[in-house]
Amino acid sequence: MYDLIIVGAGPAGIFTALELLRKGSTPHKILLVEKGKPVEKRHCPKDKTGVCVNCKPTCAITTGFSGAGAFSDGKLSLSYQVGGELPDLIGEDFAQELIDYTDKIYLEFGADPKVEGVY
């Protein structure tokens, strides 16, 4: 029996589980369900064929634990001025606070602290 089932182990699912475990007032038994493969079993046929073969039932690059970010170069936009409409919805200061909070979590789990592209 689980207190909560999270569908999707991309960044949103992973961060949701982490926040619930860290900030929950009671212990949570959480099931994180993902239709893709674990990171260590995600291999793209394009590496051998040179072309996308439209994997079925799911793409090994975009689906699986950590989502497409598992194979990204790790770039994050660390300014509310880059991206969508979040600052319009919650304000610039709060948007930046959330971005900084998220960056600290990534750093806690081993992200490279070097920041590039700052102007």
Question: What residues fall within each predicted segment?
Answer:
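Conserved structural-core and active-site-/substrate-pathway-adjacent residues in large, well-folded domains
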Residues: 6-8, 16, 74
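Short glycine-/acidic-enriched loop or helix-start segments at secondary-structure transitions
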Residues: 16-17, 42
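A generic structural signal for short, solvent-exposed coil/turn residues
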Residues: 8, 24, 61-62
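Hydrophobic alpha-helical segments
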Residues: 13-14, 64
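Beta1/beta-strand and adjacent pyrophosphate-binding region of the FAD-binding site
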Residues: 1-12, 31-33
